[in-house]
């Protein structure tokens, strides 16, 4: 393997790099800070980026930084997610068996979240990955879920994460206006520029333990 050839202790460019070792651009850190605010204030947020721009890395970092004594994080990633399976997925993660009808499952989830907030004194954060693949019916359901106690409070923070088309080809359209009006924060991760790309590579090579110069300036320009 190339790791031995270059004297590496760890593989530098893989998914399982520890969150604290991941490179963070200025845009990444700003978005991470915004998501922390979203979690604390129990808001509805949308995060988009082109493939390879750091969405999965952001989610991992966001999850790792939320204090476990203060938050319960629920995560779903299913391109065929329907409203019924949305509630079932969340209730399963909370250790509950969902009821058959969607409305009953929604009330069941809201009641459980009230217990979590009132008894455990924790806040719930729901992350939905690959959200650009969700159908309109499911996206609409988030609006209904967050309309709670006569719209006086949000039962949880909801973070939709997806490719750029989630915003450009769906949420910006008039048919999604009701959903868009509920969104409290929209963030996008841009492509890394030349300087950031060099810093990204240097950071991961440092994590690998490699002391050799592997990437020349010309190679970095090509990347």
Model-derived segments and spans:
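A short, basic N-terminal segment
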Residues: 1-41
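Conserved NTP-binding/hydrolysis module of P-loop NTPases
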Residues: 8-11, 71-73, 81-100
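Conserved catalytic network of the ASCE P-loop NTPase/AAA+ motor domain
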Residues: 37-40, 65-69, 115-120, 132-137, ...
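Walker A/P-loop nucleotide-binding motif
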Residues: 41-61
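Short hydrophobic/aromatic beta-strand immediately N-terminal to the Walker A/P-loop
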Residues: 45-48, 75, 127
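Walker A/P-loop
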Residues: 56-72
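Mid-core helix/loop region of P-loop NTP-binding domains shared across ATPases and GTPases
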Residues: 82-85, 96-141, 150-154, 192-197, ...
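Helix-loop-helix "sensor" segment of P-loop NTPases
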Residues: 115-119, 150, 159, 167-222
């Amino acid at each position: 393997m190339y790791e031995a050839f270059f004297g590496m202790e760890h593989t530098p460019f893989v998914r399982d790099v520890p969150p604290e070792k991941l490179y963070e651009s200025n845009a990444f850190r700003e978005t991470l800070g915004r998501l922390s605010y979203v979690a604390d204030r129990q808001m509805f947020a949308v995060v988009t980026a082109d493939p390879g721009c750091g969405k999965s890395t952001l989610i991992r970092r966001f999850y790792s930084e939320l204090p476990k004594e203060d938050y319960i994080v629920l995560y779903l990633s299913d391109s065929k997610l329907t409203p019924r399976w949305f509630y079932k997925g969340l209730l399963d993660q909370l250790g509950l068996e969902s009821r058959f009808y969607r409305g009953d499952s929604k009330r069941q989830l809201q009641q459980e979240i009230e217990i979590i907030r009132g008894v455990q004194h924790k806040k719930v954060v729901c992350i939905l990955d690959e959200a650009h693949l969700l159908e309109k019916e499911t996206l609409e359901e988030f609006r209904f879920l967050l309309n709670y106690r006569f719209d006086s409070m949000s039962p949880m923070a909801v973070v939709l994460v997806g490719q750029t088309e989630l915003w450009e080809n769906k949420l910006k359209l008039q048919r999604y206006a009701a959903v868009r009006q509920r969104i409290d924060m929209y963030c996008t991760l841009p492509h890394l520029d030349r300087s950031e790309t060099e810093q990204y590579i240097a950071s991961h090579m440092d994590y690998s333990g490699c002391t050799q110069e592997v990437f020349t300036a010309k190679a970095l320009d090509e990347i």
